[in-house]
A protein has these predicted regions:
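Conserved NAD+-utilizing ADP-ribose enzyme module
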Residues: 10-47, 53-125
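Short, Lys/Arg-enriched N-terminal segments with co-localized hydrophobic residues
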Residues: 1-12
Length: 125
């Protein structure tokens, strides 16, 4: 369903990223005051925000809903300079681009989020 290439959207100081989440992760984000993602579980060594909303929608709708009954797309801004340390990985089709943040660096990553994490879509609709 994707026809165009979606690199991260860079603004002068921040880059827009997306993260598909299930209801439990969304609850923890809300408990943070919409400012941080929760620590990864022991079997989750990588935190992987994605670079475009269509890919986040696909994951939330096609993976999170079957796994947990609902899925949500979050959008947030991160300091562009900080993000340069993380490679953008293409997993599958060329629009399936993710940043791979080691779980042990997530707390630091959260400190570089600018503003609030917001929900842009929810599934089922």
């Amino acid at each position: 369903p994707f026809a165009v290439f979606y690199p991260p959207i860079e603004h002068s100081m921040t880059t827009t990223l997306y993260r598909p989440v299930g209801p439990q992760e969304l609850k923890l984000i809300k408990e943070s005051g919409w400012t941080a993602f929760p620590p990864r579980l022991p079997d989750q060594p990588i935190f992987y925000p994605v670079t475009n909303e269509p890919y986040a929608i696909q994951i939330a709708r096609d993976w999170n809903v079957p796994a947990s009954g609902s899925g949500f797309v979050t959008r947030f801004e991160v300091e562009t300079e900080y993000l340069k340390r993380f490679p953008v990985e293409t997993v599958g089709a060329r629009e399936h681009m993710e940043l791979w943040v080691p779980a042990e660096e997530l707390e630091e990553f959260n400190r570089h989020i600018v503003g609030k994490i917001e929900v842009t879509r929810s599934f089922p609709e």
